[in-house]
Amino acid sequence: KNTDDGAKIYTPLTLKLYDWWVLGVSNRLAWGCPTKEHLLPHFLEHLGNNHLDIGVGTGFYLTHVPESSLISLMDLNEASLNAASTRAGESKIKHKISHDVFEPYPAALHGQFDSISMFYLLHCLPGNISTKSCVIRNAAQDLTDDGTLYGATILGDGVVHNSFGQKMMRIYNQKGIFSNTKDSEEGLTHILSEHFENVKTKVQGTV
């Protein structure tokens, strides 16, 4: 598996279905973490003025940010970058960056962002949770001294999935869309603590 396996699912067609299936049906019924009740408020609470969104999906969350926000987008998938940029409004978008998050970011981005979000990125990345530590490290380098990295990921270990969630986990992991069967809150906290002094996690449903 490589990083591209998780990104391939996001074609122009699937992006049109993403909000309904992922943010609507799956978050509520499979993962027990309804988008508008939990994930959207979480996204907006920690949003800084100069923000980098990594793993942009359809840009749903970005449609709710203040007009004054400066937003940069990072994704391996050009279709996602273009869809999110168009949906959020080109006037808000400062940079569109096609980049593999396992690789160090361009030096010009270091120390630039007040906040960085990773919503539903980590569970799509190949490997176990410990191999994803470098993804956290690379993002941390792009934050200002008092910047915040935040996000959400679907856990596979240490949580109880319902039958719908179990089926989705099995299918997505078999297809390489997810790589999260052993991802746990404890493991996530560990890799965050390797790069940040102040770490806070909360589990809602299996997210």
Q: Model-found features: residue ranges?
A:
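A conserved beta-strand element that flanks and buttresses the S-adenosyl-L-methionine
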Residues: 117-120
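Class I SAM-dependent methyltransferase SAM/SAH-binding core
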Residues: 50-105
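Short glycine-dipeptide loop
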Residues: 143-149
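Local beta-strand N-terminus motif with an aromatic residue
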Residues: 48, 93, 112-114
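Conserved class I S-adenosyl-L-methionine
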Residues: 1-47, 60
